[in-house]
Amino acid sequence: MLEVKLPGLDLKNPIIPASGCFGFGKEFSRFYDLSCLGAIMIKATTKEPRFGNPTPRVAETGAGMLNAIGLQNPGLDSVLHHELPWLEQFDTPIIANVAGSQVDDYVEVAEHISKAPNVHALELNISCPNVKTGGIAFGTNPEMAADLTKAVKEVSDVPVYVKLSPNVANITEIALAIEEAGADGLTMINTLIGMRLDLKTGKPILANKTGGLSGPAVKPVAIRMVYEVSQMVNIPIIGMGGVQTAEDALEFLLAGASAVAVGTANFVNPFACPEIIEQLPSVLLQYGYQSIEECIGRSWNHEKQPAHHRA
């Protein structure tokens, strides 16, 4: 009922912890067997280790959080020799998130990490708003996004998904350029740029001043963008942005996503992903669906009728 087939990914269910909200899975493995997950999007990997931005790097908001971590990670060598081998014990495909400051950085990381036996797909992080070079610069320019996608596709041994930024005037234009460049899929959305101020000092709470807004506050934006982009491209979308419940996951599927990533909710409830997986079948049945496939794009593809509406 929950199985989903995507380029490079045979998912037992469509629920995936989002990159940056799950580390490399070690902390969460103390709570449950990671083999229950559809896939795991590991933390962004760069060529060299990164220590990230100065603190404070996280601030709560009324319906979510701001983060300005700055792609902190142990670097490519450590991920290849320590993190990925540790994850081999789980029966779950890995989606490796690749980041960098320039095209050559992405290409080098992608070429090596795509050869790891348990990496089934790459996620190009072209939309991180919290780093001074690379990151979001690639995600806001169609030509740059396309050139980067082409370069990585040439060296990758596995399908390439590209993570889209919501901080653009026309996200569909970016998506179409990336599809034209050969991407196998899209993941969307990354965080919205936001800020909070300390009332005592009058200054920004985050040392980076701005940060990425995530959590329930961004879900309506994410749903709208998935809805728009999914009607224009012919490659699958992994939707994300404020998913906390099985009902949220279904909403993304109806908007046009083929799978759903869970981010900030993991910080609030470490059992968020397995709970959504457990509850999703009953939620699908409640609304008349017998499979994930029936739901995908139902909001705009009205030929897809729920089972209980069929003759």
UniProtKB/Swiss-Prot annotation:
CDD domains: DHOD_1B_like. Pfam families: DHO_dh. It catalyses: (S)-dihydroorotate + NAD(+) = orotate + NADH + H(+). Gene3D superfamilies: Aldolase class I (3.20.20.70). Pathway: Pyrimidine metabolism; UMP biosynthesis via de novo pathway; orotate from (S)-dihydroorotate (NAD(+) route): step 1/1. Keywords: Cytoplasm, Flavoprotein, FMN, NAD, Oxidoreductase, Pyrimidine biosynthesis. Its cofactor is FMN. It comes from the Bacteria. NCBIfam families: PRK07259.1, pyrD_sub1_fam. This is Dihydroorotate dehydrogenase B (NAD(+)), catalytic subunit. It comes from Bacillus subtilis (strain 168).
